A protein has these predicted regions:
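Extracellular glycan-modifying ectodomains
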Residues: 1-373
Length: 373
């Protein structure tokens, strides 16, 4: 028995030594495509860093991030936990062949502040302002969640937001719920699919009194059939089939101007270079940027629409550009000047606060809605 115990210890030590040697022999990686983030590097040593604990903490992060076959171990861990009956993985629910992000209870003070900021923006604006809150899959597909799984009541919040702000609303919850049986959200990502964005665009056009779009007007293109989104990365669940990204709107008909680098430059409706990387959703408009303008030369009535938005609008804006001369998109995470002043300067008379519920609850940049002075 003692010999068997010693043998087990020796084998385990050899295994650890082998892993350490493997780790030392492998070059460090700068980035994880699977997790879509920068990986920790070997920390700088100094006696001061050792004394204050930052070097030790840095070493822990370094070994955790640079561990050999990290992605395989992460996936194996998630698979083992699933076999033990676990259904929530790092804030993500496994619902059959679909991953759905849990929406936690918000910071109530921040939530109320955001609603107040939007209300003041609506009161100060010289144009029309609408509120469009996009429910996540956890609300529209709540029947798919594990039994008893907690998730924030987004429907109640959307109704409360309409009452608190006093703004006319876009019924995105109703539009998406009506089509809940269709693939309106990605299975491995938190965004809506292009089909979901199409239904969202029609809900917005309906609220604005514009002619609705017809699905038959578009010919979807399968831009990618191997999209593994943010929930794939966050959860460690790597065994589901990848998603398909579709482009519906022709990129030949619209002119795109971007301020991605901080200055005006030609943009793209679809930046296909992203399709070669993990973050394929950023192929819509080229991803995050402070300001982007879509122009449709075929619409000659001078109509302009402003979207104060998050990344959900990247796949929605091309649809709206079918009914407006110009669609302006402002992302307050990067655009830190007055939106009210921008509206006045550009002669825009209609704006929509178009946010996913999760992002709206946590946003700390709505202060930039107000006019200067």
């Amino acid at each position: 028995m003692v010999k068997k115990g010693k043998l087990t210890t020796v084998v385990f030590c050899v295994f650890l030594a082998g892993l350490l040697a493997w780790h030392i022999g492998l070059p460090d990686k700068d980035r994880s495509e699977t997790e879509n983030r920068t990986l920790a590097q070997f920390p700088e040593f100094s006696w001061e860093n050792l004394k204050n604990g930052s070097f030790t903490a840095g070493m822990e992060d370094y070994f955790a991030d640079q561990f050999p076959l990290r992605d395989d171990w992460t996936g194996l861990k998630a698979r083992c936990e699933q076999l033990l009956g676990k259904r929530e993985f790092n804030g993500v629910y496994l619902c059959g062949d679909t991953l759905i992000a849990k929406v936690d209870e918000p910071d109530r003070l921040q939530m109320e502040k955001n609603l107040d900021d939007v209300k003041r923006f609506g009161e100060a604006s010289h144009g029309r302002v609408l509120l469009g809150l996009i429910p996540s899959a956890a609300e529209v597909w709540k029947d798919r969640l594990p039994q008893g799984a907690p998730s924030f009541d987004q429907a109640a919040f959307i109704q409360n937001a309409a009452e608190k702000t006093g703004l006319p609303t876009v019924d995105l919850l109703g539009a998406l719920t009506e089509h809940a049986g269709e693939p309106i959200y990605y299975r491995t990502d938190h965004h809506w699919t292009t089909r979901g964005a199409f239904y969202g665009a029609n809900a917005l056009l309906n609220a604005l009194g514009k002619e609705l779009l017809k699905e038959t007007d578009f010919t979807p293109e399968n831009a990618s059939t191997d999209f593994n989104g943010t929930l794939y990365s966050t959860s460690g669940i790597h065994w589901l089939a990848p998603d398909t990204i579709e482009y519906w709107v022709s990129e030949d008909d619209l002119r795109v101007t971007s301020w991605k680098s901080g200055k005006e430059e030609p943009g793209r409706l679809y930046d296909r270079s992203y399709l070669e990387h993990k973050d394929k959703y950023s192929s819509f408009l080229g991803g995050n940027q402070p300001l982007c303008v879509l122009e449709n030369p075929a619409i000659t009535d001078g109509s302009k629409l402003l979207l104060i938005r998050d990344s959900y609008s990247d796949s929605l804006a091309p649809f709206l550009a079918q009914r407006f001369s110009e669609v302006h998109l402002v992302d307050l995470r990067y655009y830190h000047t007055s939106v009210a002043d921008y509206m006045a300067e550009q002669g825009i008379d209609t704006a929509v606060m178009l946010y996913s519920v999760s992002n709206f609850l946590a946003d700390r940049n709505l202060i930039y809605l107000a006019p200067r002075g």
